[in-house]
Amino acid sequence: MVVILDNYWQGDTVVTLGKDLMDVLHGKPVALARKNLGDLLIPLALSQGVPGMRKAYETLGANASQYDTSERALNTLGYRLLRMQRVPEAIAVFQWNASAHPASANVHDSLGEAYRADGQREQAIRSYRKASELAPDDARLRGILKELGSQ
């Protein structure tokens, strides 16, 4: 019996670790773990704001295999910044994510939430509309748009 414990708040690393462990046991190749994007960018957000984060993020293009730059990683980073009241930095991260993953309703929803937190109503409406177009069955998005006075 193998027991895997994890203290990462999202919990899915246990599943990934379990799959990787099984692959190793069966002689299959395993991808190397990538570094957490937030560990790199949050200190820059705190010390240099959006310009420092942007420069580091753009530099990652050549080193993307070292850092997890997935849609989920960017969204998680954006919400971490939002919870830290670093709204301009969160908006920048969500914008990068929307640019990299334009077909994701979740990304546009998150960007709308950040704009809304910043009092940018029109931008929030635009983002929520885009999210609603991509996920037309999402009643929550329709409710938010109605709340914002747009339908």
Model-derived features: positions:
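Catalytic loop of the DD-peptidase/beta-lactamase superfamily, centered on the K-T-G motif
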Residues: 1-58, 75
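TPR alpha-solenoid repeat register
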Residues: 73, 107, 140-141
